């Protein structure tokens, strides 16, 4: 195990990480999947700029507003980063691992240099609906790309990724996503010091399928694997215990989101997640879960 964390400005000693947010999205861009309005009232959101006045509506239909799905201005990102630093924050892991959802290694480095924050970049395919043909490569080809970004640099930069993820698993868990999960696992095995984060369809129970590939078929060490978006399954204690007993981490990352994810479900309330986490602690799992609050779209800035 290496005793440092790879950031966009270079290695940082583990003891210097400080207060860390292990899974955030600073420059993600979801504009490729702007959707049609789900409700009559949300027709008005399509062409509007994000403001406090329409936040209530965006919480119910966030994907129909182009401005809400667009990349965040760097000035806004720096403003929020400085707020985090003022509260004692030292490190953020950016889980945007693919250009298909707006990864921008140069922008991450610029923010790190301007704020002094430790920022970790990530590498790996996201959901197939975002990746399109980019995900239709062999397992070895996908793994080679991740390995290159971990050890040499992202794209034509010398900025190295420090996490594998977040690897996309959609509600339908496509064959291409199966293979990208295998590729990410292979890259992790070749870089055993690097952690791996998996985007889970939180309202479903695909943990066994995912871990059968990652742990069973590919042989990744479970303590290097975290399952994102565990909040919606919080009341299914048997399912969550089954995942934790395999040795992986659960991430509770919808804290404070308070939105509807169209065609998937409604994010649990803060109290629901707090109760779920407290119960797992009572059951002896205090060291196998992580809390964070993912910033996905403009309405949360």
What does each model-found stretch correspond to?
Residues 25-71, 124-140, 294-301:
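Active-site gating loops and adjacent loop-to-helix segments of metal-dependent hydrolytic enzymes
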């Amino acid at each position: 195990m290496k005793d440092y964390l790879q950031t966009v400005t270079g290695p940082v000693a583990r003891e210097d990480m400080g207060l860390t947010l292990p899974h955030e999205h600073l420059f993600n861009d979801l504009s490729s999947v702007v959707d049609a309005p789900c409700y009559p009232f949300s027709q008005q959101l399509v062409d509007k700029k994000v403001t406090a006045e329409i936040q209530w509506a965006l919480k119910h239909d966030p994907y129909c507003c182009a401005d809400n799905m667009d990349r965040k201005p760097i000035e806004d990102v720096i403003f929020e980063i400085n707020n985090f630093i003022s509260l004692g924050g030292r490190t953020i892991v950016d889980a945007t691992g693919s250009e298909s959802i707006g990864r921008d290694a140069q922008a991450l480095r610029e923010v790190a240099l301007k704020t002094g924050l430790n920022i970790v970049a990530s590498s790996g395919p996201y959901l197939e609906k975002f990746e399109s043909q980019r995900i239709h490569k062999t397992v070895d080809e996908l793994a080679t790309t991740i390995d290159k970004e971990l050890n040499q640099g992202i794209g034509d930069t010398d900025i190295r990724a420090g996490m594998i993820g977040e690897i996309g698993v959609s509600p339908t868990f496509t064959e291409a996503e199966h293979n990208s999960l295998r590729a990410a696992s292979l890259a992790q095995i070749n870089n055993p010091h690097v952690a791996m984060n998996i985007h889970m369809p939180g309202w479903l129970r695909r943990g066994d399928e995912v871990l059968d590939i990652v742990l069973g078929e590919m042989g990744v060490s479970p303590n290097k694997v975290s399952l994102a978006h565990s909040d919606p399954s919080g009341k299914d204690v048997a399912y969550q215990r089954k995942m934790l007993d395999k040795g992986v981490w659960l991430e509770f990352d919808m804290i404070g989101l308070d939105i509807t994810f169209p065609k998937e479900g409604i994010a649990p309330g803060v109290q629901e997640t707090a109760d779920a986490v407290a119960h797992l602690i009572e059951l002896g799992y205090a060291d196998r879960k992580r809390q964070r609050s993912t910033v996905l779209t403009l309405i949360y800035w």
